[in-house]
């Protein structure tokens, strides 16, 4: 394999001159540049990104660690991250954890060995333990939630407000018998959305029915199991707040398999406003998280941290909005 020394010897220049030509880091005459680049082509020389990073202290590469790429919410956020990385001439390496702590640690090590300039973390799975040893010395941005404290910038969404808005939309449609299917309540986002639900009921002077609070998971199966639990009760709610759109999709399937109609028999409110939500039958009312904005803001914040590593850490909060479609039946 050809090296810079080989190129320098054949071009009869110093290795530093070869480096300046390849990296464009200093003026070199056109004659020398053409000579060096001709030899580079003849030897089929490809400079190592890692080797170059040792000189310039950057690889123009960001790592993204995410729970799963097949979750629609994560997928849409990742699209925003990738788009903004490309706009800033950064490469993106994506690794998944699948909810496995060992895989989390292995992928973190892999990303650090690839000399990424910084990391985006979007994999705060509740199955991870807070005592997992993570020696991360890179610039970090935590997106949405993480299972332990880190020295990092954080981008969160106001999930308590989102839970309140979701429940209030059902109350405004005349519903007073409102259930909720949460994600795993070890996650702060699930806790906060539940608190928002409770706040809206309290404000409307609606008694809380603990049997209508079903803890589940932020996935399709979580919605199926959650609705099955609510439908087996002797007293059923007329509306259900699903704490993610993936839960709502599972709920749709379970409701329709029971021969029930949405929204006539059971109104459904989702959370996240994934692209699929508008294409469900009926289209899903939901709480919109600005996913593209989240992706863009995460990259902007990480690049700022890479550039200014000694700045104080920041916590940025995104505000959700309510999107009303056709999955809520008016009882008024």
UniProtKB/Swiss-Prot annotation:
SMART domains: HTH_LACI (SM00354)
A Pfam family assignment: Peripla_BP_3
UniProt cross-references to CDD domains, sorted A to Z: HTH_LacI, PBP1_PurR
GO biological process, one term: regulation of DNA-templated transcription
InterPro entries per UniProt: HTH_LacI (IPR000843), LacI/GalR-like_sensor (IPR046335), Lambda_DNA-bd_dom_sf (IPR010982), Peripla_BP_I (IPR028082)
Record carries keyword Repressor: yes
Molecular functions per Gene Ontology: DNA-binding transcription factor activity; transcription cis-regulatory region binding
Protein keywords: DNA-binding, Repressor, Transcription, Transcription regulation
DNA-binding region: 4-23
Function: Transcriptional repressor for the ribose rbsDACBK operon.
Name the record gives this protein: Ribose operon repressor
Organism for this UniProt entry: Haemophilus influenzae (strain ATCC 51907 / DSM 11121 / KW20 / Rd)
Gene name, Swiss-Prot/TrEMBL: rbsR
